[in-house]
């Protein structure tokens, strides 16, 4: 079992109101020469949680933090103009994210929760993780 110290929240950087799947993200990541989808979990707009990369395998979602973190991605994070960062989470996604983080913190009690933007000069996940989770 990997020693998990961080749970890192991401957005897919896709426009609000549009549905994408784990397979879509996997295809994008494979095209970028990743070994697999970079995230461990993906939360769809309807609030359903889907597994990506297995938890026992390091992700590919946050440079310098992959070895000891779990990556969660929600579908959305960009306005309809496809450029402007925006918190596009549906109420179902917000609830699912809170529940998933709670479950992971039970399994990894010493893990801290962060937004990708805390480690990289990015807007991702397009909301302030520290004030919401």
PLM-predicted stretches and their roles:
Residues 1-12, 45-49, 65-68, 75-133:
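Basic/polar, cationic surfaces and motifs that engage anionic cell-wall
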């Amino acid at each position: 079992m990997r020693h998990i110290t961080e749970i890192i929240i991401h957005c897919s950087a896709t426009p609000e109101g549009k549905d994408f799947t784990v397979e879509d993200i996997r295809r994008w990541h494979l095209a970028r020469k990743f070994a697999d989808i970079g995230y461990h979990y993906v939360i769809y707009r309807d609030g359903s949680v889907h597994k990506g990369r297995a938890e026992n395998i390091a992700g590919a979602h946050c440079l310098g933090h992959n070895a000891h973190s779990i990556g969660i991605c929600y579908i959305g994070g960009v306005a309809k103009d496809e450029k402007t960062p925006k918190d596009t989470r549906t109420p179902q996604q917000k609830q699912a994210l809170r529940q998933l983080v709670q479950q992971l913190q039970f399994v990894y009690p010493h893990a801290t929760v962060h937004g990708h933007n805390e480690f990289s000069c990015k807007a991702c996940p397009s909301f302030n993780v520290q004030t919401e989770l």
